[in-house]
Structure formats: structure tokens, C-alpha cells
Design a protein with these regions (language model features):
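Low-complexity, Ser/Thr/Pro/Gly-enriched N-terminal "stalk/linker" regions
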Residues: 2-4, 14, 18-144, 165-196, ...
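The feature captures the catalytic groove of carbohydrate-active enzymes
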Residues: 61, 67-69, 73, 182-184, ...
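Structural helix-adjacent loops and short alpha-helical linkers that scaffold large soluble proteins
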Residues: 102-109, 211-223, 267-286, 333-353, ...
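Extended ligand-binding clefts on enzyme/binding-domain cores
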Residues: 103, 251, 316-327, 338-431
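Long, well-ordered core segments of solenoidal/helical folds
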Residues: 112-127, 173-177, 215-237, 280-302, ...
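Active-site-adjacent structural elements in folded domains
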Residues: 188-194, 244-247, 306-316, 366-372, ...
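Aromatic-rich carbohydrate-recognition surfaces in CAZymes
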Residues: 196-296, 322, 477-495
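C-terminal capping/lid segments that line or modulate ligand- or cofactor-binding pockets
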Residues: 206, 250-267, 374-394, 429-499
Length: 499
């Protein structure tokens, strides 16, 4: 039975923290959340492991497993309900998925490898609702599993295309009861509780990350799944179940269409043929572009207030909503210039980009805060600078001190300067700011934040959603959005040969 889907995935355990930020912020769920927001977050899962039937289990907090390199398959298969032959077949499938991946070879090799392995495991899984108790002691891991060798990836090449669909999935083996089957390309936010949904934002970043490491087919699969769930008006719901349904009455978020187009634009920039994007995503991309043109066809040329990645209701427009709309329009322009038919000529799209950029500079500069004409800077400042777009006027100056304003004593970052002073760091925002810093030449900040993320993984090596004031991981682990951002940040460091 699915746990009660209380609102605010990334705010479930700290929703009350958002209340002091602005009188405009309203939390979903009302009195149901009174008192819950002030409970100290705890670690809900420590990582992932593939068990019998090829299903994916969350690891209990504190548990470790020695993995087959490049997979989330246990090196000792029997305690997890696998035979040696099943383990070998599933390992070939998992390694075939990542055979073409280009990952960094130096300082960040292990961090990037673990992020990719977890992201692929969370894409299209058959997911069990809770941890499995292995039939015997699990083989302890001595640290992060090494990246797969060239020999192991070469062996994976013999796996057929039909075997390379998903981490650990083998249709020849019966799955245990209770497994929730997600379709191919569906990126599950995290393996536990109210995170077992697909958020368009997370999926778009996952597609961009997979493209960045040379896994274009995986990236197209992620966007194809999103496209299958798109609303008729070209937008997206806040989140989806494994069947593509909406789990509650949470309103659709205006950023979804923008992130969908942005991710497609990243694939195009990474070398994906325009014909592939047209053939597989053409109509959904056109609907998304039409949606962005519609919501910016106003006197202000700005979208209406909407929930963004903070996932609280807003009556004042946030940078976290406005920026993805701009990024989506910019991507639509590039896609149209590459030959995709989006229902509007490239020139019209370019003119709307100019209008929206000018409107954002008029209304958010010079403070570039989270809210319109305010100084409450948050991680969305990264979205109005490289690597996302050309710098908007004055944003670079604000970005220079943004991380310091969001700093937590353990070394990570809060979602924004106005977040509750509870000492909790959030890994997706920290990873986003790391990527931003590295792209802007702020090398010390970027490497420091990446090193902090690397040092605050779980015992099994997974990236958690949060890190507490005492340095311990909290929330679910791994978190797909953080994994994607790690790949994007580390992929920006250097061009490397296939892993």
C-alpha cells in the first residue's frame, strides 16, 4: 500500500521552515502538517540493491552492500534472492545500459560513477516499497564500489538490445509481490515513501545529465516518458505515479514545460540529431512551446505565480518559475532553428525570448531574489547565468555572494537565504550551485561543494536529499535530482574517453 502522499516531497520534514519566508507562501495540506515540519529529519534509506526477480529495493539506513561494479547488484547474490546465473545476466543488462558513458577519470570519477549507477537504477525500475532483509549477512563494503573496468564494459557489449532496458529487470524471472513497476524512462525521485513519484523537473535534469555523459538513447527515453504524460495544454502536472496519474490535488507547475524544452535543447547541443528529436518528441515539444508562448502573452511578458522547486504555493512570482520559462523559450528557439516544427517560427520565438529576458531584468534586477522585487536570494540565481543561459543584467554580481548567504555550518547549502536556520543542508541545491560555480570559473567554490557532497554520502555511497547539522545524511537516498546534477557538474570538468 502506498504511503499517504502528504505534500511537499522536498519539504515533507521541514515544511514549517518555509512559513517564515514570505506571507505569500502557503503550504498544501493545512492542519495535517502542523507539528510535522519541526521534527528532525532522519535517514529513510541508505541506497539501492537489486534483489530476486530483478526488482529494486531501498537499503535500510546504515546498511552497506558490496556491489558488482557499475551496478546495484550485490556481489554476494544468494542472500538477496538471486542465483549466480541471474546475477550475471542482470549485470550484463546493467552494464550494457552504460557502456557508452563518458565519465570523468580524475578526482570525481567515483562520485560520478555512483551518481550514474543510481540514476540508471531509478529510471524505469520495478521498485519494492521497503528494504529487504537478506537471508544472511550482506557482504560489507569497504567503501565506494570502483567504477567498472574496460573489460567489464566490453563484456556487456554482448548483451542484446532487449536485455539492456533497465537496471536489474529480467522479464524471465517472476517478480515478488508488491513491486511497483515504472515504465521505461520514468525517473523515480527516490526509493522511499512520498518520493516514489516522477517529477518533470527531476526527469528533465536526468535527461540532460544522461545526455551529458553520452547516453543519448537513455535521455531520449526519459523525455519520451515525460511526453506520454504531458497535459493537453502542453504543460505538466507537479508529479506523477507509475501509471502516469496525478496522486493528489496539487496544482500543475508552470516550470514543467520549460524544463522539458530545456532538456531537449541540451540534447540538441550535445549532438543529438534534430531528426531524432523531431521524430520522437516533435508534437510534445510543439505543445510545450505553445504553452510557454501562451503564459507569457501578457502585458508583463512574465508567467503568473506558480509553485516551483520549493513546492509551496505562491502568490508572488518566483525566479524558480520565471527562469525555466525563459530557458524553455530559448531552447524552443534553438530547436526551431534546427528544423523542428514547433508551431511558431524561430524568429517569433526569439522575439519572445527577448521580451521575457527584458521583463525579468526589469522586475528581478538588481537584487535577483527568489521573489519578484525582493532580496531573498535562492538557488534559482544559478538559472539566470551560465551554464543555463547568457548572464542576465546584474545576476553575476548577486551570484558571487549567493552561496555564502545560503551557507550551512557543515559546509552545504540551504535552498535559499530565507530558509529556516535549522542547520540542514539540501543536496540538490548544493549540487546546482556547484555546477553553477564551476561553469562561472568559481573553481574554489565549485570544488569545495562537490567535495562536501562526496564526503556526506551514506554508508552505502548514496547521495541523500539532506544533511543534518551534525553532518549525518537524512531523507531518502539516493535522490535522482542530486545524482543528475552531480553528473552535469562533473561532466563540465573535462572531455574524457568512454568509461
Amino acid at each position: 500500500m502506498r504511503p499517504l502522499a502528504l505534500p511537499g516531497r522536498r519539504r515533507f520534514l521541514t515544511l514549517a521552515a518555509a512559513v517564515p519566508l514570505t506571507a505569500a507562501a502557503v503550504l498544501w495540506g493545512g492542519s495535517r502538517l502542523v507539528g510535522l515540519g519541526r521534527r528532525a529529519p532522519t535517514l529513510l534509506s541508505g541506497g539501492l540493491v537489486v534483489g530476486g526477480g530483478g526488482v529494486l529495493y531501498p537499503l535500510a539506513p546504515g546498511d552497506t552492500v558490496a556491489y558488482v561494479p557499475g551496478t546495484r547488484l550485490p556481489r554476494a547474490p544468494e542472500p538477496w534472492g538471486l542465483t549466480t546465473s541471474q546475477q550475471s545476466a542482470l549485470a550484463r543488462q546493467a552494464l550494457a545500459r552504460r557502456q557508452a558513458a563518458r565519465l570523468p577519470q580524475g578526482r570525481w570519477a567515483g562520485l560520478a560513477d555512483g551518481a550514474l549507477t543510481d540514476l540508471l537504477a531509478l529510471t524505469g525500475p520495478a521498485l519494492m516499497p521497503g528494504p529487504m532483509n537478506p537471508a544472511g549477512p550482506a557482504e560489507p563494503s569497504a567503501g565506494p564500489t570502483p567504477a567498472p573496468t574496460s573489460a567489464s564494459t566490453a563484456d556487456a557489449a554482448s548483451a542484446s538490445a532487449g536485455d539492456a532496458g533497465r537496471e536489474g529487470r529480467d522479464s524471465r524471472e517472476p517478480q515478488p509481490p508488491g513491486a511497483e513497476v515504472f515504465p521505461p524512462g520514468a525517473v523515480v525521485a527516490a526509493p522511499m515513501s512520498i518520493w516514489r513519484y516522477v517529477w518533470p523537473r527531476d526527469a528533465a535534469f536526468a535527461a540532460a545529465a544522461l545526455s551529458a555523459v553520452n547516453l543519448a538513447d537513455e535521455a531520449l527515453g526519459v523525455l519520451g516518458n515525460l511526453a506520454s504524460w504531458q497535459r493537453a495544454d502542453g504543460g505538466f502536472e507537479a508529479r506523477y505515479t507509475s501509471s502516469g496519474r496525478v496522486p493528489d490535488n496539487r496544482p500543475a507547475q508552470a516550470d514543467g514545460a520549460g524544463w522539458f524544452l530545456w532538456a531537449a535543447g541540451r540534447l540538441l547541443a550535445d549532438g543529438a540529431p534534430a531528426a531524432d528529436l523531431r521524430d520522437r518528441l516533435g508534437a510534445p515539444l510543439a505543445r510545450a512551446a505553445s504553452r510557454l508562448l501562451t503564459i507569457t502573452d501578457t502585458p508583463s511578458h512574465l508567467p503568473a505565480a506558480s509553485p516551483d522547486y520549493w513546492e509551496v504555493a505562491e502568490t508572488v512570482l518566483t525566479l524558480g518559475t520565471a527562469a525555466p520559462v525563459l530557458l524553455g523559450l530559448e531552447a524552443a528557439t534553438a530547436l526551431a532553428r534546427a528544423g523542428l516544427e514547433l508551431g511558431a517560427p524561430a524568429q517569433a520565438l526569439a522575439e519572445r525570448v527577448t521580451a521575457v529576458r527584458n521583463a525579468m531584468e526589469r522586475n528581478f534586477a538588481p537584487a535577483w531574489g527568489r521573489h519578484l522585487r525582493r532580496d531573498d536570494v535562492d538557488a534559482a540565481i544559478a538559472l539566470v547565468l551560465p551554464p543555463f543561459t547568457r548572464p542576465l543584467a546584474g545576476a553575476r554580481t548577486v551570484r558571487q555572494t549567493a552561496a555564502a548567504r545560503m551557507h550551512r555550518p557543515t559546509g552545504g547549502l540551504a535552498p535559499g537565504a530565507g530558509w529556516r536556520d535549522d542547520g540542514v543542508s539540501w543536496t540538490p541545491e548544493t549540487a546546482l550551485m556547484a555546477w553553477s560555480a564551476l561553469s562561472l570559473g568559481m573553481e574554489e567554490e565549485g570544488t569545495r561543494l562537490l567535495a562536501w557532497l562526496e564526503a556526506h554520502r551514506t554508508a552505502a555511497g548514496a547521495l541523500p536529499e539532506k544533511v543534518l547539522a551534525d553532518g549525518s545524511p537524512a531523507g531518502p537516498a539516493p535522490l535522482a535530482w542530486t545524482c543528475a546534477l552531480i553528473l552535469l557538474a562533473t561532466a563540465s570538468r573535462a572531455e574524457t574517453p568512454p568509461s
